[in-house]
């Protein structure tokens, strides 16, 4: 009697499907927007993580910082002169208005006059860089449509700052900040404009200690300093040099014991292939620098090696939450969104 083997193919097909599903479940699909150049960074970056959009239609989002007290992300709209708050329950909402231009200091009408970099100090207060008011200030009452700003520092040797841009606190209670002239930048013509109300003829990087009100000029040799960060041991200061003026975007490393500067990472080659600038940055507890740059978000090791790139589009800044389980980033005017991605 001839055996009927017609059942073999259907059963084999079912086994194959089950096996394929098992393999697929066990092997997450890598996100094509994440490029890994050094496998050691995979201890931090999950190559299968998806990019989430948290907010859009913000004219120029910037200055993201995680507020551990309210479990919220704070960020500003530089062009809209507002500060926003995002959390899992409510999504994005307007939190403080105005944020960076209140009439405190003379400025020009066409500049980028809203706030920019933010930090939460040890007392839980927001310390904010204000382009329009040309100072670093502390916000006393939040949330508010009539916020009270207290000046922390607003001049160098009696001359008003340009447009304080970004800042980072040191473990000794002082903070470092950058002072490029974006309050005098015409976004229509994409040019910096000299004006009689501009008092300083350089773009500085400073240290200010609120305990004794001592202001020190760290360097004035970086033509357009922007994002700023500190190594975990607080011995090295990182400053993003945008390169808009000379075409040489770089990350500058400053030894705070010797005050010697060096080029940590040269972004010129990347800038010839990708859109984006060395704008804001944040430093991971591992010492790796997560910075906006050509191609999106770049991860640079303390030794200056490119570890990874995540294609969020053209970015302005980045930050982590308390336990570094998420990375939050903000986009430029041609990419006006706030994103996050899950980390390992």
Residue ranges and their predicted role:
Residues 1-2, 175:
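Short linear motifs centered on Gly/Pro in flexible linkers and helix caps
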Residues 13-22:
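Hydrophobic alpha-helical membrane-insertion segments, chiefly the h-region
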């Amino acid at each position: 009697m001839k055996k009927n083997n017609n059942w073999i193919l259907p059963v084999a097909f079912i086994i194959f499907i089950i096996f394929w599903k098992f393999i697929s479940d066990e092997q997450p699909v890598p996100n094509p927007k994440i490029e890994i150049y050094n496998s050691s960074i995979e201890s931090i970056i999950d190559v299968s993580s998806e990019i989430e959009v948290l907010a859009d239609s913000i004219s120029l989002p910037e200055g993201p910082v995680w507020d551990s007290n309210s479990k919220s992300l704070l960020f500003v709209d530089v062009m809209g002169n507002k500060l926003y708050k995002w959390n899992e329950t409510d999504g994005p909402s307007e939190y403080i208005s105005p944020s960076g231009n209140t009439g405190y200091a003379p400025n020009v009408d066409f500049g980028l006059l809203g706030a920019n970099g933010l930090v939460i100090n040890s007392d839980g207060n927001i310390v904010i860089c204000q382009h329009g008011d040309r100072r670093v200030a502390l916000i006393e009452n939040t949330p508010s449509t009539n916020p009270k700003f207290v000046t922390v520092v607003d001049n160098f040797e009696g001359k008003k700052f340009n447009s304080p841009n970004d800042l980072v606190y040191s473990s000794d209670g002082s903070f470092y900040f950058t002072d490029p002239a974006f309050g005098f930048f015409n976004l229509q013509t994409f040019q910096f404009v000299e004006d009689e109300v501009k008092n300083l003829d350089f773009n500085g990087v400073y240290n200010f200690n609120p305990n004794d009100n001592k202001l020190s000029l760290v360097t004035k040799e970086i033509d357009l300093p922007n994002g700023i960060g500190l190594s975990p041991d607080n011995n090295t200061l990182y400053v993003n040099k945008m390169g808009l003026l000379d075409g040489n975007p770089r990350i500058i490393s400053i030894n705070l014991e010797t005050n010697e500067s060096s080029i940590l990472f040269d972004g010129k080659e990347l800038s010839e292939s990708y859109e984006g600038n060395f704008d804001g940055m944040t430093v991971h507890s591992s010492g790796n620098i997560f910075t906006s740059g050509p191609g999106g978000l770049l991860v640079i090791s303390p030794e200056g090696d490119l570890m990874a790139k995540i294609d969020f589009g053209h970015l302005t800044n980045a930050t982590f939450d308390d336990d570094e389980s998420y990375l939050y980033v903000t986009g430029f005017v041609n990419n006006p969104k706030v994103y996050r991605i899950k980390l390992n």
